[in-house]
């Protein structure tokens, strides 16, 4: 019974999270700074499916395009920490933790068994490796600043 309630609560939580995040689409104005000193123009709203600790959700976000840089800008993705990824920071942290503790395939199994979350072995591996690289870069920066 408790696992059935957990599953129902996770679905309810995912629905609530999706609705809360939908309140802000990321549309700031017709033009925004692209991050490289140019102006990116609003083009349209685009959908993105995110994998969260509450299951998958879909967001509708404002998409801007910078013709000078020939690249897209999605402010809401930056704000939510999901630019260039479909894993939310919460789920990424869980995948990092299991990926650092056990072999990646076992980590995938643990996420499914303990949290009801389905990720591929490769996604657990990529997540753990990405965080490992970020930690190594932070250590290198700290060492350079400390003069060692």
Which residues make up each language-model segment?
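Short, conserved DNA-binding cores of transcription-related domains
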Residues: 1-63, 67
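Short, positively charged, Gly/Tyr-enriched micro-motifs
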Residues: 56-148
